[in-house]
Amino acid sequence: MELLHQHGLSGRLGARPGTAGAARPRGVPARAARAEPLAPGQNVVLPDADLAELSVVFGAAGAEADLTLLLLTADGTVRGDQDFVFYHQPRAAGGAVVLGPKGTSGGLATETATIRPRSLPAAVQRVAVSVNMDTDAGTDCGQLRDARLEVRGAAGTGWTFTPPADPGISAMLVAEVYRHRAGAADEVWKLRAVGQGWSDGLAGLARAHGVEIE
């Protein structure tokens, strides 16, 4: 995809704009309840009360990581450039997915995003939440320390996941938010912790989700 080539796919997609302090996402209580930890592969049903807006925060020390999100169809691929959310294109689907600013919290570098499941187009079946390292600088996920993803719903329910510090990968699918329907039951939204990735960084992540790399 031309969008990715224009911003330097082999590394971190171009120079990072100036960072700002991370503000608390709209709709999330200032004093939120304790978050439930998730194990790799574990999934949970997201309560209806939390679906208006999900706050996503990734934090880590050590090497810098960039948060990226992909809006995926039922076959696990993007529909086009518009479904790739990163710091040069921080909004998708009319604001249903928005990448927020970088900041710091508790000694960790943080980056935020919001996902509004109810506002996503019907063709979007899942949102992949990933982090990628700067392969041009030779960094990988093994250099991340105290990495932590927190997802919190509009009503304050929260979940956390500690992704593995794997030196063999430089882009990782950390978690995904997805539609689920079992038989005749009503559709629900679920959150799954993943923690798997690609040794060739963002290029591998992109190819795995239908982005053509020349």
Task: Name these PLM-found stretches.
Residues 1-214:
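Intrinsic-disorder/low-complexity signal
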